[in-house]
Amino acid sequence: MPKMKSNRGAAKRFKRTGSGKFKHRQAFLNHILTKKTTKRKRHLRHTLVTSGSDQAALRRMLPYG
C-alpha cells in the first residue's frame, strides 16, 4: 500500500505536540497592524491548541504528524 499524503496546507500551519494535540499560530498578525492595539498584538503572539472538534480532521490530514 502506498504512503498516505499529508495535506500540505495543514502541514505548514499545524504541529503535533507530544501528547498528540495540535498547536497553531494565531491569525491577524501579518499586516495592517497599525490600527491594532499593542495589547491585542501581544495576545496574538501566543500559540493555541486546536479545539477537540478539529482533532479528528487534523489527524486525517496529517497522518505522520
From Swiss-Prot:
A Gene Ontology molecular function term of the record: structural constituent of ribosome
Basic residues: bias regions: 10-23
Keywords annotated in UniProt: Ribonucleoprotein, Ribosomal protein
GO cellular component terms given for this protein: cytosolic large ribosomal subunit
A GO biological-process term: translation
PROSITE patterns: RIBOSOMAL_L35 (PS00936)
InterPro entries: Ribosomal_bL35 (IPR001706), Ribosomal_bL35-like (IPR021137), Ribosomal_bL35_CS (IPR018265), Ribosomal_bL35_sf (IPR037229)
One Pfam short name: Ribosomal_L35p
Region annotated Disordered, chain positions: 1-23
Highest taxon above the source species: Bacteria
Keyword Ribosomal protein: yes
Database matches in Gene3D superfamilies: 4.10.410.60
Family stated for the protein in its record: Belongs to the bacterial ribosomal protein bL35 family.
Listed PANTHER family: 54S RIBOSOMAL PROTEIN BL35M, LARGE RIBOSOMAL SUBUNIT PROTEIN BL35M
HAMAP family named among the record's database cross-references: Ribosomal_bL35 (MF_00514)
Protein name: Large ribosomal subunit protein bL35
Source organism of this protein record: Acidithiobacillus ferrooxidans (strain ATCC 23270 / DSM 14882 / CIP 104768 / NCIMB 8455)
